[in-house]
Amino acid sequence: MDINGRSLPETVLLSIRGRKARKANSTPRKRVEGADMVVASYNVHKCIGTDRRFDPERTARVIREIGPDVIALQEADNRFGDRAGLLDLARIEHETGLVPVPVSGNGKGHGWRGNVLLFKRGTVRDVHQIKLPGLEPRGALVAEIDLDEKRTLRVIAAHLGLLRRSRSEQARVVLDIMNSQDERPTLLLGDLNEWRLGNRSALNTLHTTFSPTPPAVPTFPSGLPVLALDRIMANRHGMVSSVEAHDTPLSRVASDHLPLTAFVSL
């Protein structure tokens, strides 16, 4: 298997070396000069950690560690049954200022097909809930947020499927969304389940609009990340910078994915 130009054993070795070199830091990242916001994508694995414990408070603590202005969560609702939301959103709002983008028809769920988009400032102008093709119930949540009187940001929160063919079809749907909307600064945040490169990769499909693609940052599995399943991408050059995994003792156990963070300049 080839991952970002390296073999899997090489990637594992680099991950081990990098883990030894990194110092744990549970405080929010210091904002780089010129950055307008901190954004993140986090597959919370239904709030079940690597210790197999269901602990939504622990998930919320990881979000507090990150200190994001916008964060896309995946697997934040039960997948079956009543698909109830798993987080205490009222408490998260009280402690972080983050509120969910509203969705319709979700019953007891927080979001759309497990996708929850939280933001700290601005006003939601428009929301689209997109069903993505494939055997699994995957979706994308598209929100346009007026940050102030002059700036509007479009955010696409998505969780692509496990099957390569499904991912390719789903990536094309994401591009269709972009082509059907007015041109504006757009972020794609999500678990794309894609680490391979090449013509058959969903990343290659997305590259036509979300380019240049930021460097791949391994986020899975959280204990020893070797696969860059999670991505933060933008449709404008220089909009996304300093993409990093939020790697702390807490985040390593809270989910099977590490959160991915980045700075955004508009």
Where are the regions that the model predicts?
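Active-site beta-strand/loop signature of hydrolases that rely on acidic residues for catalysis
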Residues: 38-44, 59-84, 154-158, 170, ...
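Active-site environment of divalent metal-dependent phosphoester hydrolases
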Residues: 47-49, 78-84, 108-110, 163-165, ...
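Structured beta-strand-rich core segments of catalytic domains in phosphoester-bond hydrolases
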Residues: 2-31, 51-52, 70, 75-152, ...
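Metal-dependent phosphoester/phosphodiester hydrolase catalytic core
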Residues: 151-153, 160-165
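Metal-dependent phosphoester-hydrolase catalytic domains
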Residues: 1-28, 123, 129, 135, ...
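Transmembrane beta-strand segments that form the barrel wall of outer-membrane beta-barrel proteins
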Residues: 129-130, 156-160
